[in-house]
């Protein structure tokens, strides 16, 4: 198995575990997730911490876990494209609250950095795979 594919799959697994952990923490109302800010109601697509947590668990937890399993087990070339798509989705989900509410929060900035890294890993891996295929075709000619 390609070393880059292992690293990208490991990063996706780490993000999946983080999404499951944060989603569970939010659902259990642990930490800072007590009352949903009233100024967010009507401006954000979610109106409670629970709906936000379930969205994060399903989309980012299950999505990244599925991509990680694909990368570790199936050894497929689609891992990089799916990783880039999940990175773009995390990037968009991180920027959206700043646009809708008009303020940046520390977790949003951290998620933005994580999303940019995931997007970059996916794009780099995909470009590398494309370059390998181009070189193989050139050798055959």
Model features per residue range: what roles?
Residues 2-141:
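Topology signature of small-to-medium multi-pass alpha-helical membrane proteins
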């Amino acid at each position: 198995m390609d070393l880059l594919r292992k690293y990208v799959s490991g990063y996706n697994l780490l993000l999946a575990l983080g999404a499951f952990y944060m989603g569970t923490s939010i659902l259990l109302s642990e930490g800072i997730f007590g009352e949903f800010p009233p100024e967010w109601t009507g401006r954000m697509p979610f109106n409670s911490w629970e709906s936000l947590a379930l969205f994060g668990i399903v989309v980012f937890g299950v999505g990244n876990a599925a991509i990680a399993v694909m990368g570790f087990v199936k050894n497929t070339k689609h891992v990089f494209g799916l990783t880039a798509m999940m990175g773009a989705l995390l990037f968009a989900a991180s920027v959206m609250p700043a646009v809708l509410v008009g303020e940046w929060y520390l977790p949003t900035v951290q998620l933005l950095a994580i999303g940019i890294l995931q997007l970059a890993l996916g794009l780099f891996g995909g470009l590398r795979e494309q370059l390998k295929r181009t070189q193989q075709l050139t050798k055959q000619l």
